[in-house]
């Protein structure tokens, strides 16, 4: 296929007079059970194009192709394709090019068009057309008008070089200005574009735009740029009708495609209408996933409160990315001040609104120390069960992929299989890849591994909760930093490889090393819990749950090590009480039952206060604890892992919520004693 040569004007636009040329629109997505996204990106392109009579009279969209299947099988079902249009991103690039390659082999005169964020900008194309000779046209930036003009030229003279916003066989045309009036583009939802898909046996999710553009220019992101920093709006009347459509079609999950929802005053009103539609429709859509703006704190709080009261939002994401000033300067990002962020988190927790704090590991400018200090600051700000740490990957059109930027910051990447969680392993016919940052001028690969291990420990044992109560205990009563606690845990694990913890540590460390040195996959499989892929921390959590008794039996050894390294003596009765409570509060997959026991201090209220940012002194005395298990998993590991980890992680469901603490009259005066100097 490397020698494909097709002369201009030789794309067949018809075989029979007065017949229509067949167009196929591809936007591949992952199937989660029976759930999949409607192809909004390419759907809105066709919704606009078909309003032009000359296109509608001469071109027929035969089908939207969205399922990831064997590429040969996909192409074998096509009927004389004359145009194949692909909407691409990091999760479907390899699938798209595999299908496009076969289409061109079997139908050499088919016009193949690629667009979407994964298509390199014109100034970054390089040898793109040599590498992908089966692609005829690439669309850069916003695609609706460019796509329609391509179809018009296909019908007529095929003078594609005259169309702004594309590259054609190495020739790049002038940049197309962004469309200011987005309402000229019909909604693919409201115009019936997706009607054919509802005949298929799937539950659909939807992407929803209320505006386009991002005023920020973070170097790791391809959302904002010099040409996309102004925000343009869709009309509110259209938006309300689309939300009513989602309710009518029983769309369970809506993902908002806005970069900064909450940045505009009108967004509060839009949120109110979403909540009202959900209330009046019997609960649809069930959830709305929002990318909130990072600076409009009061407005965002209003919106989150509205959605939370209707049980619509999965929680608010605080995308800090880094807490280090130098790193933020390097990636051209500004954050809320720490005091404001801390108050923000506590405000949401007080109102019962879940927060998720996101950090990116591997950003240029970050060091091991700054990464560690950032994690410490976030945990001190009470982001205890909400910390999500993502690996930095380089996107084709992000400023971080600029050659000068990569050279300046000595960015080294590794191509590794895309880290996609909660999908059935081995079922996907084509592997997708990420360009993962593993080294920068300020962080060598060995320090990157240390950061990965600290991230793993913090997320497994703190965010997911296996040792969170104990870490809070040592922090508040001994002054031991959270990150020190987890660094010591990693040391202990390495020194004790035959323990449950040690084995899990070695397994994780090997996985990290294989991924960053050999480009192996990051995903994990735990056969006892669902046939699906899990992140590092989720897999460790599940494996430890299989050996929970042994894991907690080993904690005396770890606390002896911690006592020696940090110079504290832990009063054994208090430590035993915290261990008992920590083990009991974790949701388990065994038969549901009520657990009751007595302890010598008010651990439950102490822990609950800490989770919402209230630092109160631990009260001593005798307390009766009653923990009720409402789940009754009865050993059903599949249901357990789905409800508690897959669905429930964002809601902090790894801990039982029905915990009653009742004081008993007898006093308990044991105190924590500092180690002798």
Question: Each predicted region: which residue ranges?
Answer:
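Glycine- and acidic-residue-enriched helix-capping/strand-helix junction motifs
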Residues: 32-45
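Radical SAM enzyme core and accessory elements
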Residues: 1-28, 34, 54-61, 76-80, ...
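Conserved C-terminal portion of the radical SAM core fold
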Residues: 83-85, 240, 245-257, 281-283, ...
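Glycine-rich beta-alpha loop elements in corrinoid/cobalamin-binding modules
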Residues: 58-175
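N-terminal [4Fe-4S]-dependent radical SAM core
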Residues: 2-23, 160-163, 167-207
């Amino acid at each position: 296929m490397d020698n494909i040569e097709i002369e201009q004007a030789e794309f067949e636009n018809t075989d029979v007079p007065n017949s229509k040329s067949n167009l196929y629109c591809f936007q591949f997505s992952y199937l989660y059970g029976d759930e999949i996204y409607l192809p909004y990106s390419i759907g809105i392109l066709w919704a606009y194009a078909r309003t032009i009579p000359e296109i509608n009279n001469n071109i027929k969209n035969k089908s939207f192709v969205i399922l990831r299947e064997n590429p040969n099988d996909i192409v074998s079902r096509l009927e004389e394709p004359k145009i194949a249009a692909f909407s691409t991103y990091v999760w479907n690039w390899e699938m798209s090019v595999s299908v496009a390659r076969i289409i061109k082999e079997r139908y050499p005169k088919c016009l193949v068009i690629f667009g979407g964020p994964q298509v390199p900008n014109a100034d970054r194309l390089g040898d793109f057309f040599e590498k992908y000779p089966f692609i005829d046209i690439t669309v850069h930036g916003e695609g609706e008008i460019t796509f329609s003009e391509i179809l018009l030229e296909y019908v007529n003279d095929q003078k594609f070089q005259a169309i702004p916003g594309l590259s054609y066989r190495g020739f790049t045309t002038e940049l197309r200005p962004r469309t200011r009036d987005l309402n000229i583009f019909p909604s693919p939802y409201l115009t019936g574009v997706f009607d054919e898909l509802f005949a298929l046996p799937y539950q659909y999710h939807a992407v929803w735009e209320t505006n386009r553009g991002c005023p920020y220019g973070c170097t790791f992101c391809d959302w904002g740029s010099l040409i996309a920093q102004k925000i343009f709006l869709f009309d509110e009347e259209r938006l309300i009708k689309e939300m009513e459509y989602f309710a009518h079609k029983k769309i369970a999950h809506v993902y908002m495609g806005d970069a900064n929802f909450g940045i505009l005053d009108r967004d509060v009103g839009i949120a109110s209408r979403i909540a009202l539609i959900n209330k009046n429709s019997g609960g649809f859509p069930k959830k709305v996933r929002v990318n909130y703006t990072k600076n409009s704190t009061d407005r965002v709080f209003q919106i989150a409160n509205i959605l939370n009261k209707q049980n619509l939002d999965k929680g608010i994401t605080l995308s800090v990315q880094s807490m280090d000033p130098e790193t933020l300067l390097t990636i051209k990002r500004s954050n809320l001040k720490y005091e404001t962020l801390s108050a923000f988190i506590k405000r949401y927790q007080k109102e019962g609104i879940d927060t998720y704090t996101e950090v990116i590991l591997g950003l240029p400018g970050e060091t091991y120390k700054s990464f560690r200090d950032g994690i410490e600051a976030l945990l001190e700000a009470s982001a205890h069960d909400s910390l999500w740490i993502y690996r930095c990957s380089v996107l084709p059109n992000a400023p971080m992929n600029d050659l000068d930027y990569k050279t300046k910051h000595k960015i080294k990447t590794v191509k590794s299989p895309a880290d996609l969680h909660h999908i059935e392993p081995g079922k996907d016919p084509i592997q997708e890849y990420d360009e993962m940052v593993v080294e920068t001028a300020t962080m060598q690969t060995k320090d990157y591994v240390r950061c990965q291990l600290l991230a793993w420990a913090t997320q497994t044992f703190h965010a997911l909760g296996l040792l969170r109560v104990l870490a809070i205990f040592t922090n508040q009563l001994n002054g031991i930093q959270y990150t020190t606690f987890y660094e010591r845990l990693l040391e202990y694990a390495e020194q004790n490889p035959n323990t449950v913890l040690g084995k899990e540590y070695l397994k994780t460390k090997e996985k990290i090393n294989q991924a960053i040195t050999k480009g192996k996959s990051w995903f994990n499989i735990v056969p006892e819990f669902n046939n699906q892929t899990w992140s590092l921390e989720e897999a460790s959590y599940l494996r430890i749950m299989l050996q929970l008794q042994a894991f907690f039996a080993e904690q005396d050894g770890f606390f002896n090590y911690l006592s020696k390294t940090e110079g504290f003596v832990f009063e054994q009765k208090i430590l035993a009480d915290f261990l008992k409570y920590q083990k009991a509060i974790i949701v388990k997959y065994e038969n549901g039952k009520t657990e009751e026991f007595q302890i010598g201090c008010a651990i439950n209220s102490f822990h609950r206060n800490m989770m919402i940012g209230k630092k109160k002194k631990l009260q001593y005395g005798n307390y009766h604890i009653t923990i009720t298990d409402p789940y009754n998993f009865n050993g059903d590991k599949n249901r357990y892992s789905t409800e508690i980890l897959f669905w429930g992680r964002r809601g902090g469901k790894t801990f039982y919520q029905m915990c009653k603490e009742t004081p008993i009259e007898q006093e308990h005066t044991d105190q924590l004693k500092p180690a002798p100097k």
